[in-house]
């Protein structure tokens, strides 16, 4: 409904504007058709650079004289026009162009108004070369006859060069002039008027601060009033009031400032129902009218400029308007035109003129850093008298400086802290200083009169009677030769103006020196005095605090070219009062180390809602936010019915319903206890009918379930557990008994809380009564901080475009391992043909986070660079970016802010028309791969999880791949999250491959063996000493089994359903430890083998003592395990069948203390226990042998028995605790390190083999790692625009031309194919009967004449060799005829 109404407002505005103001099609080029006399300039450089050559696309261009101190180009449009755009070019084929300029306009050549762009910036950007046309479409259309362009900067390699185009249309002006005692009224044609929509529009200009512009009213309290108060425009409107309506209808809105500047200001009011717009000079203020009515009921007339007749008594305190009003439009009726025509429905009060009679004071604009105006005076007079008028916003500035004659000293008038300070310094005497006035920097005109003569001085401000300041002091006055207004020139020694005051910035007029009015026209043309950096006949003051760029009710204070914001008592901070001062929840205070108490929170951050005070119940694991209200005590209700129910509104302390709703919406859990007691009063009545009583929650939604129940069902708590008094009912109170019953419980559905009203409707019977009781709202948690989403390649989320007006702040956390990607981007409509506004935050490189934007000043970016670490380290990083009219800044984590101040008068309007992309740039370019969470834009959290779509590559949360992997990591591989996929870390396994599923083995020839040193003798001694002190072995705790705690761990060869007993959890590697990690209280051994020979030793672990471990094949081909722990050996027969069948076999042995777990192939897991006489430790492991034992020292005879001739076959997947010798041998890059080369030795031929094992699954290549990957619906992105259309037409034209040429070539070359033409005469028919031809004469044979045929010409027979006959000698010879047979 809201969007429909706003659309209707815009539609009404367009229709009314098109008919009443001529906007439609107002785009004519106005300079080209003008005569040469309409183009003028301050000067010209040469004969072919005069103003007449300044037309757009002309053969030359205008250039002023070198040294012209105030160059300008002026256009006389011959009549008033509406102007909508201006375009510039440089001088043709030259290095002369203007880079910045000012646009002035007016109705006469001696009074100019600067055009201010949005942001109160009077400077337009110009050209960068001599040929390109730079066009500026103005944000509002103004009316003028004269246009003046003032160049401010130009190409430093050339000079000023300009060609100009102005776009608009003719404008019909109907002007009414009021002198303060005049007024007119317009009577409706059909008496009273009633309307759903209205449009009021007009233009005005004045020098007064107060005045009534328009007024109309009705008998039912309806009225519309537009007036000036303090040079601000005020709109008062009401759609009526009624005693039965609870809300008053009066609404007042304000716009603009310093509107008494004698410039035309355009006003427009659009209303549709209660939705309304107030437009002033292009700035639109949208608002909603108070009250409940939607139609405007007016009596029979509208008053313009004041009140007429008896209506004056209604607004007797209002001043009539003094100034000019133009084209007053009411609902497509031009009242001003009717007044000019003296229509019968127009009533006049006083002498209303039909042309402007405003004075022309010729002001001077002081806007430069070293501006001044110097005028001569009458020297050596005994009385110094100066007067002038000024207006400014600045607190300080030099108003006047004059050096006294005869070296007596000087006189200074300066503005300081809003008052005029006078300083008279004389040689040999104490300086005289005094002040006058108060708050003279208010932007209005103030008149200063200063007189100094012998022994006394006097100054008066604004000719206020009795307010002048008189000072008696011994003075000797002799006037000097020069008076400096607005500042001192540089260097001061040359001009004799020595003042340490800053230059004055503002406007001055009516300068008088020694009682004589200064002729400023002579000053402008250098015929009197001197000046620098000033503009004549214009005043460029503007109200930079209207509209107010200080947010959250911050106070705006302005100077000549800037403004500042004071944010005290607002709850916000920053240059525009945008940044929240308080934390968003009690949970944030808990995390910062606070204790329970009252705190101020701001749930929506920098959003529009105000902060408020709550009680924070801070506990160890959570913080409860408690919001109290005015219904904490029992409320009794009687006499209510369903027709006239009781409305129990809940007013929360220190907060509105919207602010409390924002708290609940941001919380993880909320609850509110509600209790309803009844005496002969019903609650719900039936489960399907409309209830007697209910409660209203967030967004004014009605809810029919009560405490302890669930949303969507019309029940109380007893209705869920079937414990109501009457089992057939769903609430205790529905029993309707003459005794007190109660339904109570907690309301816990967050999206419905808080409770805002309780409606009770069944207490109108005799002796019936109801009571309700509501406890405070209690919430905890923060569901916005962990609103997380994961992105895969090419995925992105689309949200509605940013609507941020003048400020935008973005904050979010990201986590990624990708080197680059765009976090978010929003593009807007084009500024011009080649540029579009945008805002983008991205990870540009692994060490750079960039905030890039274009708000109209070109591409700009801020970069946070990291030297100490990379941002793609798979850790969470906080990004905060902010942009407003004062500055742009960026911060990552706790690094310092990267800040860039905006140029003065920068305007930002961050309302885009394209979708906001999260996770990529527009059209899914430069996608981000990783996780984002807690993304906020101006305090509003984007629901990332709610937009997650697995089919498009986005998933909620930042984990999940390793929790439920598609293929697990085998053999103890560690699962590593990679956002759009996962990888398996196989470093601690004896396998490789994507899922640690590829066997790494070696084929052992007879006599081949491998040794891997587990530790040196020195480390063994250290280990023994550590064991004696009962300290944990470096790297692992007792009972460690590698991979046991790894997500996705699948024990190799343990078979289905295998689970290790609950022994102590493994330890973690010690940082900095680099040697092989061992464990004396347990081992885990796994490997595969295949062989056809026996006996052999497959694996042997030796020690520096007599302990060892061995797995061997006996003579009969069976597999045996031998342990030597302590003094006595332990022998276990692993298989009873031979394993020398040439097939792969797997072995997995795990020992934990005296418990031994064994699995061979896929046979069931067996468990063995060592005797208590056997030690539980494998002391001082020394080396690991594969294929054959080549250990020195004493070796068990049984091992020696099976050690010769050695193993012949294949071993793979060998792992002893964390040692994988075959993987180390085959996968370590060459050359090896010296330490590793010393630890590992191979004797004989050992070649890599997987021993015939097949991988468990076919590995897949993730999209990010596949260079040839394309998504299923890979789009083609292009941004060629209209260039692509032109290229398409050009290619089509060339193809058509080529086809046409081929067709013509074909027709030309095959036109006569198969035929020939001759010049033979037609055959002569004889007169013989039957039409037979005569016989040929005797002699040489002749070819018969061809017989005519309609479709074929027969080929003649070849002539004989003797040549043609006599009759054929005159015929043309044909090539075929000349050939012989």
Swiss-Prot record:
Stated name of the protein: Contactin-associated protein 1
Domain F5/8 type C stretches: 26-169
Leader peptide range in chain numbering: 1-20
The organism's place on the tree of life at top rank: Eukaryota
Biological process terms in GO annotation: axonogenesis; cell adhesion; central nervous system myelination; cytoskeleton organization; mitochondrion organization; myelination; myelination in peripheral nervous system; neuromuscular junction development, skeletal muscle fiber
Pfam families registered for this protein in UniProt: F5_F8_type_C, Laminin_G_2
PANTHER family in the cross-refs: CONTACTIN-ASSOCIATED PROTEIN 1, PIKACHURIN-LIKE PROTEIN
Residues recorded with modification Phosphoserine: 1380
Role of this protein: Required, with CNTNAP2, for radial and longitudinal organization of myelinated axons. Plays a role in the formation of functional distinct domains critical for saltatory conduction of nerve impulses in myelinated nerve fibers. Demarcates the paranodal region of the axo-glial junction. In association with contactin involved in the signaling between axons and myelinating glial cells.
CDD domains per the UniProt record, alphabetical: EGF_CA, FA58C, LamG
Cytoplasmic side stretches: 1306-1381
Every Fibrinogen C-terminal domain range: 577-796
Tissue expression remark: Predominantly expressed in brain. In myelinated nerve fibers of the CNS predominantly found in paranodal axoglial junctions. In unmyelinated nerve fibers of the CNS diffusely distributed along the entire surface. Weak expression is detected in ovary, pancreas, colon, lung, heart, intestine and testis.
TM helices/strands, residue ranges: 1285-1305
Main location: membrane
Residue spans of biased composition, Basic and acidic residues class: 1319-1329
Membrane side Extracellular: residue ranges: 21-1284
Intrachain disulfide bonds: 26-169, 324-356, 507-539, 545-556, 550-565, 567-577, 931-958, 962-975, 969-984, 986-996, 1210-1251
Species this chain originates from: Rattus norvegicus
Keywords on record: Cell adhesion, Cell junction, Disulfide bond, EGF-like domain, Glycoprotein, Membrane, Phosphoprotein, Repeat, SH3-binding, Signal, Transmembrane, Transmembrane helix
Keyword check for Nucleotide-binding: no
PROSITE patterns per UniProt: EGF_3, FA58C_1, FA58C_2, FA58C_3, FIBRINOGEN_C_2, LAM_G_DOMAIN
Any one GO molecular function term: SH3 domain binding
Residue span, EGF-like domain: 544-576, 962-996
InterPro entries listed in its UniProt record: ConA-like_dom_sf, EGF-like_dom, FA58C, Fibrinogen-like_C, Fibrinogen_a/b/g_C_dom, Galactose-bd-like_sf, Laminin_G, Neurexin-like
Compartments, record wording: Membrane; Cell junction, Paranodal septate junction
Extent of Pro residues compositional bias: 1334-1363
């Amino acid at each position: 409904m809201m969007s429909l109404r706003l659309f209707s407002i815009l539609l009404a505005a367009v229709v009314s504007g098109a008919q009443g103001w001529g906007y439609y099609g107002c785009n004519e080029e106005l300079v080209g058709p003008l005569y040469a006399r309409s183009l003028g300039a301050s000067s010209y450089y040469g004969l072919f650079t005069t103003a007449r050559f300044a037309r757009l696309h002309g053969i030359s261009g205008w250039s002023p004289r070198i040294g012209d101190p105030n160059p300008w180009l002026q256009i006389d449009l011959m009549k008033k026009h509406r102007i909508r755009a201006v375009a510039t070019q440089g001088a043709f084929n030259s290095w002369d162009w203007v880079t910045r300029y000012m646009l002035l306009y007016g109705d006469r050549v001696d009074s100019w108004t600067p055009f201010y762009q949005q942001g109160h910036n009077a400077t337009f950007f110009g050209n960068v070369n001599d040929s390109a046309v730079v066009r500026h479409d103005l944000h509002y259309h103004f009316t003028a006859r004269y246009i003046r362009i003032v160049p401010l900067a130009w190409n430093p390699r050339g000079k000023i060069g300009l060609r100009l185009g102005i776009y608009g249309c003719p404008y019909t002006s109907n002007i009414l002039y009021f002198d303060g005692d005049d007024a007119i009224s317009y009577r409706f044609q059909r008496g009273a008027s009633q309307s759903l929509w209205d449009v009021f529009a007009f233009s005005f200009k004045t020098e007064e601060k107060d005045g009534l512009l328009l007024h109309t009213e009705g008998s039912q309290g309806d009225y519309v009033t537009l007036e000036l108060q303090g040079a601000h425009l005020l709109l008062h409107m009401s759609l009526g009031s009624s005693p039965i309506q609870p809300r008053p209808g009066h609404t007042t809105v304000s716009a603009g400032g310093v509107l008494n500047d004698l410039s035309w200001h355009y006003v427009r009011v659009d209303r549709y129902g209660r939705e309304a717009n107030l437009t002033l000079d292009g700035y639109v203020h949208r608002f909603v009218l108070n009250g409940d009515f939607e139609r405007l009921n007016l009596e029979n007339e509208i008053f313009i400029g004041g009140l007429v007749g008896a209506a004056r008594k209604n607004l007797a305190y209002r001043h009539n308007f003094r100034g000019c009003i133009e084209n007053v439009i009411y609902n497509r009726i031009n009242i001003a035109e009717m007044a000019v025509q003296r229509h019968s429905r127009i009533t006049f009060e006083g002498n209303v003129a039909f042309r402007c009679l405003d004075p022309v004071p010729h002001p001077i604009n002081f806007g430069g850093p070293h501006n001044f105006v110097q005028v001569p005076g009458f020297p050596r007079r005994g009385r110094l008298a100066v007067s002038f008028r000024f207006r400014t916003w600045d607190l300080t500035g030099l108003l006047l400086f004059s050096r006294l004659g005869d070296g007596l000293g000087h006189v200074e008038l300066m503005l300081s802290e809003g008052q005029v300070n006078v300083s008279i310094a004389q040689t040999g005497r104490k300086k005289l200083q005094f002040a006058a006035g108060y708050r003279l920097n208010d932007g209005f005109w103030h008149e200063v009169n200063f007189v100094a003569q012998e022994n006394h001085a006097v100054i008066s401000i604004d000719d206020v009677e009795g307010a002048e300041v008189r000072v008696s002091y011994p003075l000797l006055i002799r006037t000097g030769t020069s008076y400096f207004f607005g500042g001192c020139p540089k260097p001061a020694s040359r001009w004799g103006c020595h003042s340490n005051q800053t230059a004055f910035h503002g406007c001055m007029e009516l300068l008088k020196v020694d009682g004589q009015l200064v002729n400023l026209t002579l000053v402008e043309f250098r015929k009197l005095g001197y000046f620098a950096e000033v503009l004549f006949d214009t005043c460029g003051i503007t109200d930079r605090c209207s509209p107010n760029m200080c947010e959250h009710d911050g106070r705006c204070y302005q100077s000549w070219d800037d403004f500042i914001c004071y944010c005290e008592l607002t709850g916000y901070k920053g240059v525009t009062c945008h940044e929240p001062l308080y934390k968003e929840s009690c949970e944030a205070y808990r995390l910062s180390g606070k204790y329970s108490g009252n705190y101020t929170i701001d749930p929506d951050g920098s959003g529009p809602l105000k902060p408020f005070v709550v009680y924070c119940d801070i506990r160890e694991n959570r913080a409860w936010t408690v919001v109290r209200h005015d219904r904490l005590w029992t409320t009794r209700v009687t006499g209510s019915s369903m027709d006239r129910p009781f409305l129990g509104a809940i007013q929360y302390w220190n907060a509105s319903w919207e602010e409390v709703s924002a708290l609940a919406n941001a919380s993880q859990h909320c609850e509110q206890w509600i209790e309803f007691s009844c005496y002969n009063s019903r609650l719900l009545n039936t489960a399907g009918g409309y209830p007697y009583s209910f409660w209203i929650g967030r967004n004014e939604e009605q809810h029919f379930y009560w405490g302890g129940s669930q949303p969507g069902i019309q029940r109380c708590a007893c209705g869920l557990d079937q414990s109501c008094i009457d089992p057939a009912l769903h609430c205790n109170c529905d029993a309707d008994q003459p005794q007190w019953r109660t339904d109570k419980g907690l309301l816990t559905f967050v999206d419905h809380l808080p409770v805002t009203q309780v409606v009770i409707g069944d207490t109108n019977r005799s002796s019936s009564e109801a009571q309700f009781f509501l406890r405070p709202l209690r919430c905890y948690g923060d569901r916005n901080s962990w609103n997380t989403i994961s992105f895969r390649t090419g995925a992105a989320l689309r949200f509605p475009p940013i609507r941020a007006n003048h400020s935008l702040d973005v904050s979010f956390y990201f986590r990624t391992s990708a080197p680059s990607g765009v976090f978010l981007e929003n593009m807007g409509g084009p500024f011009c043909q080649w540029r579009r506004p945008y805002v983008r935050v991205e990870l540009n490189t692994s060490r750079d986070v960039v905030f890039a934007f274009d708000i109209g000043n070109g591409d700009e970016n801020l970069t946070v660079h990291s030297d100490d670490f990379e941002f793609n380290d798979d850790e969470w990083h906080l990004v905060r970016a902010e942009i407003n009219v004062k500055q742009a800044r960026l911060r990552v984590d706790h690094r310092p802010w990267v800040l860039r101040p905006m140029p003065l008068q920068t305007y930002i309007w961050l309302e885009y028309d394209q979708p906001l992309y999260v996770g990529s740039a527009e059209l899914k370019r430069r996608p981000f791969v990783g996780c984002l969470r807690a993304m906020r834009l101006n305090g509003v959290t984007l629901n990332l999880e709610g937009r997650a779509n697995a089919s498009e590559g986005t998933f909620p949360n930042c984990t999940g791949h390793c929790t439920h992997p598609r293929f697990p990591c085998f053999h103890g591989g560690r699962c590593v999250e990679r956002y759009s996929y996962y990888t398996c870390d196989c470093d601690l396994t004896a396998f490789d491959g994507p899922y640690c599923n590829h066997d790494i083995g070696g084929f052992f020839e007879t006599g081949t063996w491998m040794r891997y040193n587990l530790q040196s003798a020195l480390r063994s001694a250290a280990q023994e000493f550590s064991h004696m002190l009962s300290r944990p072995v470096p790297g692992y705790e007792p009972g460690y089994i590698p991979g046991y705690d790894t997500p996705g761990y699948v024990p190799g060869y343990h078979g289905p359903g295998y689970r290790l007993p609950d022994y102590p959890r493994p330890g973690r590697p010690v940082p900095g430890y680099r040697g092989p990690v061992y464990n004396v209280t347990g081992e885990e051994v796994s490997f595969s083998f295949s062989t056809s020979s026996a006996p052999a030793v497959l694996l042997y672990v030796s020690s520096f003592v007599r302990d060892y471990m061995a797995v061997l094949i006996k003579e009969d081909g069976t597999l045996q395990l031998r342990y030597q722990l302590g003094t006595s050996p332990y022998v276990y027969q692993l298989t009873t069948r031979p394993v020398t069948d040439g097939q792969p076999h797997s072995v997995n042995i795990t020992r934990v203390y005296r418990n031994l777990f064994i699995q061979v192939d896929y046979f069931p897991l067996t468990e063995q226990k060592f005797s208590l006489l056997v030690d539980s430790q494998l002391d001082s492991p020394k080396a690991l042998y594969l294929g054959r034992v080549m250990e020195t020292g004493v070796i068990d005879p049984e091992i020696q028995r099976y050690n010769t001739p050695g193993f012949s076959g294949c071993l793979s997947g060998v792992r002893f605790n964390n040692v994988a010798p075959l993987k180390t041998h085959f996968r370590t890059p060459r050359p090896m390190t010296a330490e590793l080369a010393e630890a590992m030795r191979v004797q004989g031929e050992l070649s890599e083999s997987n021993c015939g094992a097949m991988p468990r699954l076919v590995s897949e290549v993730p999209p990010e790692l596949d260079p040839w990957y394309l998504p299923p619906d890979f789009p083609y992105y292009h941004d060629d625009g209209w260039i692509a259309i032109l290229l398409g037409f050009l290619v089509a034209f060339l193809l058509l031309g080529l086809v046409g040429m081929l067709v013509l070539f074909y027709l030309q070359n095959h036109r006569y194919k198969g035929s020939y033409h001759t010049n033979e005469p037609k055959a002569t028919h004889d007169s013989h009967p039957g039409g037979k031809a005569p016989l040929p004469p005797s002699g040489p044979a002749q070819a018969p004449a061809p017989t005519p045929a309609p479709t074929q010409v027969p080929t003649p027979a070849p002539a004989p060799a003797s040549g043609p006959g006599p009759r054929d000698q005159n015929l043309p010879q044909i090539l075929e005829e000349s050939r012989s047979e």
